[in-house]
Amino acid sequence: LAELLGVEVLREVEAALKRVKPDVILIAEPWSFRGHIAGALRDTGWASWNDGYRDFMKDYVRGNGDGRRMEYFLRGSPWYFAKWPAQSINYTESHDDRTWIDVIAEREDGNGHVPTAHDRRRTHLMAALLFMSVGVPMISAGQDFLRSKHGVANTYQRADLNALDYRRLRRFASTHAYFAEWI
């Protein structure tokens, strides 16, 4: 929630940390309920989560998206988001909100607990694009075995949905292996 701190405070934090550890890696979640500062972080040493990448990939794997935007994201979002390659933290799922498989599930209720073959193919396409894109790929715990929160978006106090179901690792071993090959 770096936006709450603001760019000037983030610059101060960066300067202080780099005095102690010059090669420190700094990553920001560039938004809050008030706004978004990813573009402003472009001229700092901070990398940030690329939510534009996340949103585009969700649409692209469903057949919506154009080649120019795909090229932009494959190149690491260079014109607005990132000045240098590692500044773009490319992701399609994080700890918050619904999981990737719930978001792209064919089921109308958005529950990806029982993914279709198409859902799995879309996930493999996303993984290939994520790992070949310029920038830093970020995957969420369990994303490689199609973790589902049963379509629930806000699981802040839902340990039953936030816990990893490792039985899915066996059930979706080929998807896990596909991610592992890219890594």
Give the predicted meaning of each segment.
Residues V114-P115, D165-R171:
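Short histidine-centered catalytic/ligand-binding loop motif
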Residues V152-N154:
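Reverse-transcriptase-like RNA-dependent polymerase core
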Residues Y156-Y166:
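Acyl/amide activation-and-transfer machinery of modular secondary-metabolite enzymes
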Residues R171-I183:
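Catalytic cores of secreted or luminal carbohydrate-active enzymes
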Residues L10, E14-A141, F145-L146, H150:
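Conserved alpha/beta catalytic core and glycan-binding cleft of carbohydrate-active enzymes
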Residues L1-L4:
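Active-site groove signature of glycoside hydrolases
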